[in-house]
């Protein structure tokens, strides 16, 4: 995939985007990622065509316009790493207020520099562990997402306290999602998650991309999220 291919796919998926602006920012992002990746090993993807397809496009494959209808949306990306999907979503949807929590200081430094280079506004990056960060952001977010960070049972505990009522938890998963759903039953009950998530699977380039969409309907007990040690030691079932 080249840059023009990527832009065409994005125009089909998100027809409202400013293609010229998006193309310009993707180029800046890609060049800076490649430059810094030689020093800091931010991603295993270094070939241009892989970055356009696997790094950018596949990171937002499961997202849809309706997730971003709110014109004053607070979006949290947990463990954004080198910026996907969070920074890329901000490029596509400039109106969002983007919050990123990332515990890796090297990656936080990269993200801060990237935001400056892209001249993005209303991006707030915190160098913290998520379980500590969320304690100060109870019922603050309209949408919380993450990609390949932790098992679902952990993500639910980290995210649900931070969601507003009717807020959305949108988690990108692998083919192992059924096992993760089963392992998350106990914590789902404790978090008063009554509805099953909406599951979407997309087949692309011989791979299956899965998203789990939860809607928060009930307040969460203020004991959550617990400490990381307590979360890890908690029985899955």
From Swiss-Prot:
Q: Where in the cell is it found?
A: Cytoplasm
Q: What is this protein called?
A: Ribosomal RNA small subunit methyltransferase G
Q: Which InterPro entries match?
A: rRNA_ssu_MeTfrase_G, SAM-dependent_MTases_sf
> Could you cite one Gene Ontology molecular function of this protein?
rRNA (guanine-N7-)-methyltransferase activity
Q: What class of enzyme is it?
A: transferase
Q: What is the lineage of its organism?
A: Bacteria, Bacillati, Mycoplasmatota, Mycoplasmoidales, Mycoplasmoidaceae
CDD domains (UniProt xref): AdoMet_MTases
What's the name of its gene?
A: rsmG
The keyword Methyltransferase is annotated on this UniProt entry: yes
Q: What is its EC number?
A: 2.1.1.-
As for family, the record states: Belongs to the methyltransferase superfamily. RNA methyltransferase RsmG family.
Its function, per the record, reads:
Specifically methylates the N7 position of a guanine in 16S rRNA.
Which SUPFAM superfamilies does the UniProt record give?
S-adenosyl-L-methionine-dependent methyltransferases
Q: Which UniProt keywords apply?
A: Cytoplasm, Methyltransferase, rRNA processing, S-adenosyl-L-methionine, Transferase
- What GO cellular-component annotations does this UniProt entry give? cytosol
Amino acids binding S-adenosyl-L-methionine: 79, 130-131, 147
